[in-house]
Design a protein with these regions (language model features):
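N-terminal pre-domains immediately preceding structured catalytic cores
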Residues: 2-262
Length: 262
């Protein structure tokens, strides 16, 4: 066997060996009402961070986006917006409004750090997604491991040690970002309804059906009257409303249970 064929065979064997799996692409998911940014590897959750989204008057945009680069130690330039009138340029530094790093996902909108720790978990920004500085640094390190491996951990440490010098890192692969607005969520047998922070009238029967289906439930025989009763109990609340699915919809079964039933 030639040297070339030997190398190919060894590489193939390594990939197919038990316990050796190729890393799946990382993607980010933000459901605005939950104020949490979730990191997925394939379909597996690997990280979850509390965030601050845009306030009702300056909502965070929803849709599908991608992150192409990171700016470490960013400056802040007031955008051409009414709310920024009279604001002054802020150079890079520990107290910069952008924090230690910002991740661009669409013009004028970023995922970034913040010195305003108390804002995390609330709709408080002008549309950007704010994170605790420690969290956005940890997230950015993870993205660099997958999409910019040429920038080492030691190099990032050196960048962070000089907070007044901005450094841009371009990713070799785009990081997918999904931002959605779904106040009704079903997880681990519990149905939760988050405050409708943008007053979109988004707590409704269709949203309940969708959340239950996404949670693995068979909604074919779901009683519409029970759904309407639940919506009336849950809507227009300022805090999270949650109950076990079995309590809200007593006769509802998961799809797996429905299939296995005699």
């Amino acid at each position: 066997m030639s040297l070339r064929n030997t190398v190919i065979a060894l590489a193939t064997a390594a990939l197919l060996a038990p316990g050796v799996e190729a890393q799946e692409l990382i993607r980010l998911d933000l459901n605005i009402p939950t104020s949490r940014l979730v990191v997925y590897e394939g379909d597996r959750v690997i990280k979850s961070y509390p965030v601050s989204v845009g306030k009702a008057s300056h909502g965070t945009p929803d849709g599908n986006f991608s992150i192409t680069h990171a700016d470490w130690n960013p400056d802040w330039r007031p955008p051409q917006r009414e709310w920024a009138r009279g604001r002054e340029y802020t150079p890079p530094g520990l107290n910069n409004p952008m924090g230690r790093v910002k991740l661009f996902f669409m013009p004028l909108y970023f995922i970034h750090g913040t010195p305003e720790k108390e804002s995390i978990g609330t709709p408080a920004s002008h549309g950007c997604v704010r994170m605790l500085n420690a969290d956005v640094v940890a997230l950015s390190r993870l993205l660099h491991e997958r999409a910019a491996p040429h920038v080492t951990k030691a190099e990032i440490d050196r960048i962070l040690a000089n907070p007044r010098q901005t450094r841009r890192v371009n990713f070799r692969e785009e990081i997918a970002v999904s931002i959605r607005y779904e106040p009704v969520v079903v997880e681990n047998g519990t149905i939760r309804v988050y405050p409708d922070v943008y007053d979109r009238k988004a707590v409704h029967a269709e949203g309940v059906y969708q959340a239950l289906m996404m949670g693995g439930y068979d909604v074919a025989g779901l009683d519409m009257a029970a759904v309407r009763t639940f919506v009336e109990r849950a809507k227009n609340r300022r805090t999270v409303f949650q109950v076990p699915v079995a309590e809200a919809f007593a006769s509802l079964a998961t799809r797996a249970e429905a299939v296995s039933a005699p």
